[in-house]
Design a protein with these regions (language model features):
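Active-site diphosphate/adenylate-binding microenvironment
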Residues: 1-23, 130-183, 187
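Periplasmic-binding protein-like
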Residues: 8, 50-55, 118, 267-270
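Glycine-rich beta-alpha junction loops
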Residues: 11-13, 84, 122-128, 154-156, ...
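A short acidic, amphipathic alpha-helical/loop segment
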Residues: 17-21, 38-41, 65-66, 139-140, ...
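Conserved catalytic cysteine-centered active-site region
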Residues: 19, 34-52
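Thiamine diphosphate
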Residues: 26-29, 45-48, 67-70, 76-96, ...
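Glycine-rich anion/phosphate-binding loops
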Residues: 55-64
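Terminal amphipathic helices with adjacent charged low-complexity linkers/tails
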Residues: 113-131
């Protein structure tokens, strides 16, 4: 197979973890659907292989509309899903021409009978992860007032005791849908001064379109809990008029929270390093 020159990857992945010495073109996208369509555009213009790299999570299902286009346009796209969270043993007939399971990128480069577009599952060692928690809650507890609204999900753990504001724990465990929209919807009732959402990175990516809703207002404050400093999230929110910042989890203070609250503008803060 020809040397890989183009990679599009979702921003929740660290490309260096998989291809530390990659010297070609690499483009970060916020979500799987966008990543694949960016890849189809590059492939169509250059007539060269494009690798689209994303997690094998529920969100990876949205990549298949773009892969269907790649199939019918006969574009040289390789969809690489990291991990085996979903069962892709049975693929749709009009999405890919070949399907492989490998344990390293070197194996992908050495595949000689690869018929494109293709789907490759990249096996990685399973990580045992508990429910995420964040030091941001400790600072919020001392910063919110009775006139605030705080929303989070079952994917984040914290002790609700001691919060002066209204606290809502929404959704179900492992459900990633609608977190941002829930806070937006609550804000439209205009019963509170400030509407705060603390969400995981995956929850943000599943509902990121909510930031562009016409009803977004200055009472909204979102904290996005990430493993790493995902600058793409801040760039996206800033393009939609949000005040943005990023703070390491072990450095966040009550003063940081107060600064965000005091600007009285719609805001998004990435808290990374949990």
């Amino acid at each position: 197979m020809n040397q890989i020159k183009h990679i599009v990857y979702t921003s929740d992945l660290d490309l260096r973890s998989y291809l530390p010495s990659f010297m070609g073109e690499s483009i970060s996208a916020l979500d799987p659907r966008s990543a694949v369509y960016i890849g189809t555009g590059i492939a169509a213009q250059n007539n060269e292989i494009v690798v689209v790299l994303l997690k094998s999570s529920n969100a990876s299902r949205s990549a298949y509309s773009g892969m269907t286009e790649a199939y019918y346009r006969n574009l040289p796209i390789i969809l690489v899903t990291v991990g085996r969270e979903l069962d892709y043993s049975v693929e749709l007939n009009d999405v890919i021409n070949s399907h492989y399971v490998v344990s390293s990128f070197k194996e992908i480069e050495n595949l000689s009978d690869l018929v494109l577009p293709a789907h490759i599952e990249l096996e990685v060692p399973e990580k045992v992860e508990g429910t995420k928690s964040s030091s941001v809650f400790k600072c919020l507890k001392d910063s919110v007032s009775a006139d605030d609204y705080l929303y989070t999900s079952h994917n984040l753990s914290f002790d609700v005791d001691g919060f002066k504001c209204k606290v809502v724990v929404g959704g179900m465990e492992n459900c990633l849908e609608g977190a941002l929209s829930n806070v937006l919807g609550a804000s439209l009732a205009k019963k509170r001064r400030r509407y705060i959402g603390v969400v995981t990175e995956d929850e943000f990516l599943h509902d990121m379109n909510a930031l562009g809703n016409i009803n977004v207002n200055d009472s909204l404050v979102y904290f996005v809990i990430c493993d790493q400093n995902n600058e793409t999230i801040c760039d996206y929110a800033k393009s939609l008029g949000f005040n943005t910042s990023s703070i390491a989890a072990d450095e966040i203070t009550k003063e940081d929270i107060k600064k965000v609250f005091d600007n009285k503008k719609k805001s998004l803060v990435v808290v990374y390093g949990e």
